[in-house]
Amino acid sequence: MNLAKYIDHTALKPETTKAQIAQLAQEAREYEFMSVCVNPAHVKYAKSLLEGTDVLVCTVIGFPLGANTPAVKAFETKDAIADGAGEVDMVINIGALKDKNYDLVAEDIKAVVDAAGDVTTKVIIETALLTDEEKVKACEIAQAQGADFVKTSTGFSTGGATKEDVALMRKTVGPDMGVKASGGVRSYEDVMTMIEAGATRIGASAGVQILKGEEAKGDY
């Protein structure tokens, strides 16, 4: 099991500097993580640092609130891909889900999936804000719109990934769709717990410490 290939090595805080992106990319090269996950403004720079490697640049769309319109999310997706993004993690319209406006939730996801084309799309449902019924519905809609993954959390809300949520998401989408656990995954033990629950990708800012088997003290 190549644990590094499960990990999106992440730096999404608003105060992230160019130097921190350079460090993130260097660590990703050294440890051969699946991707670095950075905000859209950092995609082009991260891509330039990872030329000639297998490490993808992942970015986030409508992040962290998910409250942009479908058209804005689609534009953001296309712009990020033009800059070199190889994967996109979008946040759903959480309020629309709460309102049971499932057509809008679906339209929003489809806008990004269509804009992304062959680029992997992950759909962040922000589990901490949802009931179990809403989590299931969000996963069903994401799957129906052709997304590649469902993802637990932004890491910027009231809670992160739990093994219970990952297991529920896996049960909902079946064996073939990706499930990404993110938010509060800080140790080797955390990662293994999430993988055992059904996760096929991990979002973490503590990727190096995880691989070293260390408990990290980061925020997300």
UniProtKB/Swiss-Prot annotation:
Active site per UniProt: 89 (proton donor/acceptor), 151 (schiff-base intermediate with acetaldehyde), 180 (proton donor/acceptor)
GO molecular function terms attached to this record: deoxyribose-phosphate aldolase activity
Catalytic activity: 2-deoxy-D-ribose 5-phosphate = D-glyceraldehyde 3-phosphate + acetaldehyde
GO biological process, one term: carbohydrate catabolic process
InterPro entries hit by this protein: Aldolase_TIM, DeoC, DeoC/FbaB/LacD_aldolase, DeoC_typeI
Subcellular location: Cytoplasm
Record keywords, A-Z: Cytoplasm, Lyase, Schiff base
Enzyme class: lyase
EC number: 4.1.2.4
Pathway(s) annotated for this protein in UniProt: Carbohydrate degradation; 2-deoxy-D-ribose 1-phosphate degradation; D-glyceraldehyde 3-phosphate and acetaldehyde from 2-deoxy-alpha-D-ribose 1-phosphate: step 2/2
One GO term describing the cellular component: cytoplasm
Gene3D superfamilies to which the protein is assigned, alphabetical: Aldolase class I
Membrane-spanning intervals of the chain: none
HAMAP family, alphabetized: DeoC_type1
Family statement: Belongs to the DeoC/FbaB aldolase family. DeoC type 1 subfamily.
Protein function: Catalyzes a reversible aldol reaction between acetaldehyde and D-glyceraldehyde 3-phosphate to generate 2-deoxy-D-ribose 5-phosphate.
Protein name: Deoxyribose-phosphate aldolase
